[in-house]
């Protein structure tokens, strides 16, 4: 499993398995330590993506940092948003930098928007 690590305004990915060392970010999120083995984003086939909401056309409402929007400019893996059914909502006005998801997985459904990647 490759997990994201925040470095400035970028997400870098590192190998992680149960028992490996982690550290807690300012937001309280665990991430791999800096010395963990790096993983190139070109080798990642599936990005499990956190979100606050997902629109009916796959537009993702994130947490405001733009980390995943910047990542998805170059990352080519399948972008799967994961949340609860209540987070699959009507669309809102996306901004120019927003990148759509390929799919959304909730406790009640799997929806594919842009299955090609």
Language-model region placement:
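Fold-independent oxyanion-binding glycine-rich loops
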Residues: 32, 50-52, 84-85, 107-108
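A charged, well-structured terminal subsegment
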Residues: 35-44, 101-117
């Amino acid at each position: 499993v490759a997990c994201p690590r925040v470095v400035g305004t970028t997400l870098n990915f590192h190998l992680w398995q149960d028992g490996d060392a982690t550290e807690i970010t300012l937001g309280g999120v665990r991430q791999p330590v800096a010395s963990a083995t790096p993983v190139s984003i070109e080798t990642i086939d599936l990005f499990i993506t956190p979100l606050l909401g997902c629109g009916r056309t796959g537009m993702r409402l994130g947490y405001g940092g733009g980390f995943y929007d910047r990542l998805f400019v170059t990352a080519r893996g399948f972008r799967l948003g994961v949340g609860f059914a209540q987070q699959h909502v009507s669309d809102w006005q996306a901004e120019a930098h927003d990148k759509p998801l390929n799919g959304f997985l909730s406790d009640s459904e799997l929806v594919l928007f842009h299955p090609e990647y």
